[in-house]
Regions:
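Canonical Radical SAM [4Fe-4S] cluster-binding loop centered on the CxxxCxxC motif
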Residues: 18-64
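Conserved AdoMet/S-adenosylmethionine-binding subsite of the radical SAM
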Residues: 89-215
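Short Fe-S-cluster ligation motifs
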Residues: 64-85
Length: 215
């Protein structure tokens, strides 16, 4: 699925959900890529072919994604979320082009992106500026309270420097994106949650604790 939404603790094609609930406003999620530069211990990507969001035919082209938008019942959209079953910044050029298309074609919608925040390391340059005027919210996975724990969980291919780079990216995003949040899941324990809160205080970042969903 390219465009999907939530349904019964799982996922469903956006247009199919609209057929079931034609009067509802729904968040539209964009499944952009299955690639990632992390290999998180908790990641649902390990399910691969057993998961609805695994792109079995490979990554959809930018034109195919645009056409999916043009064919979708946009009158039922609440917000647009660039998320899916991989790290969206792995297709950075296409991502910026897609966000530009959304901004120009559907200017009334708020757009959020979920990311691991490692695009500066992936491309060897500052990347937050590329999202200026294109995102209303960026949600960045903090995961843990220090670099060692972060690397143990994310198994980032960039090693121990990943944690600081992610935090620096989050701070940089505040210069270009109205709403910047970092997230952790609620299963990491109270002590770790409190430690993450202290990190966010140090970096002046907004923390959101989200429920872990294994679906």
């Amino acid at each position: 699925m390219i465009l999907y939404t939530l349904h019964n603790n799982g996922y469903i094609d956006f247009s199919e959900k609209v057929k079931l609930f034609p009067k509802e406003k729904l968040n539209m999620y964009v499944n952009f890529t299955n690639r990632c530069n992390c290999n998180c211990t908790f990641c649902l990507r390990h399910l691969k072919d057993d998961h609805k969001l695994w792109l079995k035919d490979g990554e959809p082209s930018l034109e195919k994604i645009k056409q999916a938008f043009l064919n979708a019942p946009m009158e039922n959209v609440a917000d647009i979320v660039i998320c899916g079953f991989g790290e969206p910044t792995m297709r950075l050029d296409d991502l910026v082009k897609l966000l530009t298309f959304i901004h120009q074609t559907y200017p009334k919608f708020k757009v959020r992106m979920n990311t691991n925040g490692l695009s500066d390391l992936e491309y060897g340059k500052k990347t937050a500026v590329l999202f200026k005027g294109l995102l209303n919210t960026i949600s960045i996975s903090l995961n843990e309270s220090n670099a060692d724990k972060y690397l143990e969980v994310t198994r980032s291919r960039f090693g121990i420097k990943s944690y600081k780079a992610m935090l620096d990216f989050a701070v940089d995003c505040k210069n270009y994106i109205p709403n910047v949040v970092v997230t952790i899941v609620d299963i990491i324990g109270e002590d770790e949650i409190n430690a993450c809160k202290k990190v966010c205080e140090e970096y002046n970042l907004n923390l959101r604790i989200r429920r872990y969903e294994a679906n």
